[in-house]
Amino acid sequence: MPKHSLEQIKEKITERSKKTRELYLENIFNPKNQPKIESLGCANIAHVTASMPEHLKMPLGSHKRKHFAIITAYNDMLSAHQPFKNYPDLIKKELQEHNAYASVASGVPAMCDGITQGYDGMELSLFSRDVIALSTAVGLSHNVFDGAFFLGVCDKIVPGLLIGALSFGNLASVFVPSGPMVSGIENYKKAKARQDFAMGKINREELLKVEMQSYHDVGTCTFYGTANSNQMMMEFMGLHVANSSFINPNNPLRKVLVEESAKRLASGKVLPLAKLIDEKSILNALIGLMATGGSTNHTLHLIAIARSCGVILNWDDFDAVSNLIPLLAKVYPNGSADVNAFEACGGLVFVIKELLKEGLLFEDTHTIMDTETQKGMQNYTKTPFLENNQLVYKDAINHSLNTDILRPVSDPFAANGGLKILKGNLGRAVIKISAIKDEHRKVKARAIVFKTQSEFLERFKNKELERDFVAVLPFQGPKSNGMPELHKLTTNLGALQDMGYKVALVTDGRMSGASGKVPSAIHLSPEGALNGAIIKIKDGDLIELDAPNNALNVLEKDFEKRGINPLFLETLENLEKPSFGLGRELFTSLRLNVNTAEEGGMSFGIKV
């Protein structure tokens, strides 16, 4: 039955995507779009090889050696991206052992949401995904490469790289992660310290010490947010070397896994990206998201990725998959364990084995791990080890080593996935239920409407919010201000929830992948900037958020006939004016062209 249901979901997606998918494949494999180094003029070729070692110039210029692109998101600001500094040299060295070479074709920007969280720079965050996609395309537009490596990990970077890569889907491509930082202070202790600071129980210096014990090394943050959800999705899509997501950066195995990615691409056996990414692989990523309680941000990113290769995915598909796939993992914020503990007790390889065993994952996909004798997701059911400095894969364990963190399909944490779609007279919204305790999944309370995130924080500081209420924060969607994450509200709402108050959040903005403790109806669509119903809400309106029943409604008789709350008239009138400061004015055209959250929040102006 589950297998049959998954097949039905896939068939619906295939049918609605028939024309757009055919057009994508036709364009990607059009002969005029294929790499052309042999047909370039001699001056053009000389520019390609000018900076290369002398002994490689003629072989590469005459295409006697394969030449691969490296698109890197390396910088020192992101702990997860700092390890990428040395990856190009590792890749180049390994490729030369296989009569091939690589060039860093482009660097792409990579911003840290952890740094900009709660500040104006966060308004660039979602749009940075599209800038990364554009930057990726610029790097590959030289059109002289036989394939490409993509070095990225964090929130907007992997989706942006993949969106850009899919415009060059004729190239064989491998995504290379850096892995999570080693564990520091437990994530729940960090969250408690933030709440204690918000309540005035500890001072700034005490909080800073705790934060630095949490974020203390190279690698991704150890909670299961968007960055680590990205890595999960790349595994489920078959774009990583198998089970390479959660190996720490300084583990000797990490270097060998990077070298293995180079071997894979040099072998010539990796299919073009457009043949790897299709309805099945996209659904596999969605299945993995639900089974592991992944980030809400992928209700945007996965849709954008799918549309970039002609596949029309929507929130109804998320709902259908969530109803079918059980929750198998409890990693912070869904539980107290971090991704290192998750990896130690079985990790993604156990999740994949379980889903395949129960017919809850498409096995017959193409991956970068395909061999002549074995293709598909079975290649991701083995664990990598280092023996005599050689990479070997062995059968993974068949049971979880800690059922408080990881469980089999036969005994899941929940029968359904970690995300739900809410519907009602406010529109449609996303909620992450896997981190919400049962007693908080339904809230009926009066609305308090806020114009800005800072207004909420100020009123909390003044102890004006110590009651049951639903916080309503409109004009945080893509067209309003770039859809910033509102994770800074989580600490304060969580503190109020711990005090015994019934609280919830309704917004057209986003939350961090680390959010989840407080019931939050996010990505509300239509957004306020498109005259969505959220801008009709007034202080005192009774709102019901009922996650178990997928419902979100304002329980006022006059609501649907009501006009805009006068509080927001000025905001609505000023939407087309640019926001200045921190470069936000440069992103005005992206904001004005962006599509809806349900369509992926893409700003390219492409209609799919």
From Swiss-Prot:
Binds 1 [4Fe-4S] cluster. Keywords: 4Fe-4S, Carbohydrate metabolism, Gluconate utilization, Iron, Iron-sulfur, Lyase, Metal-binding. It comes from the Bacteria. InterPro entries: 6-phosphgluc_deHydtase, Dihydro-acid_dehy_C, DiOHA_6PGluconate_deHydtase_CS, ILV_EDD_C, ILV_EDD_N, IlvD/EDD_N. SUPFAM superfamilies: IlvD/EDD N-terminal domain-like, LeuD/IlvD-like. The keyword Transmembrane helix does not apply. One of its GO terms (cellular component) is cytosol. This is Phosphogluconate dehydratase. It comes from Helicobacter pylori (strain ATCC 700392 / 26695) (Campylobacter pylori). The lineage of its organism: Bacteria, Pseudomonadati, Campylobacterota, Epsilonproteobacteria, Campylobacterales.
